[in-house]
Amino acid sequence: MIRVLLVEDDPVIRDTTCYFLKSQQNFEVVCAETGGDALSHAREKFDVILMDILLPDTNGVDLCQRLRSWHHCPIIFTSCLDDTDTIVRALEMGGDDFLAKPYNNKILLARIMANIRRVQM
């Protein structure tokens, strides 16, 4: 079972992504709308974290730094902010990958699997 923590405040993106991932075989998805919600789930074991950068209560990059103190699973950022500086900062602060919104679900799935595969090596 692949466990995913999806941190996304936009209900349409969250629901669509959650539905798509749950339709894949062997996926369990836990959804969080805010950074606070994500932190409440953070002690659980996840294989990958998908996280928006713009959250209502915190910046996803700052949240990533906090999560890195005890989580070593891949963190994939998703954001409509796709300028070079934002992407570089997200990766430098602990993110493993970045996917600009709107994203294709097949590409998202491929990125999830590639990041998990890299960790399992």
What is the role of each PLM region?
Residues 34, 59-62:
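Acidic catalytic/metal-coordinating carboxylates
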Residues 11-30:
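Two-component/phosphorelay signaling modules centered on CheY-like receiver
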Residues 85, 103-112, 116:
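C-terminal output helix
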Residues 56, 83, 101:
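The feature encodes the CheY-like receiver
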Residues 31-48:
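Acidic, metal-coordinating helix/loop segments flanking the phosphotransfer/catalytic sites
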Residues 8:
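Conserved acidic carboxylate
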Residues 52, 79:
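Active-site residues of response regulator receiver
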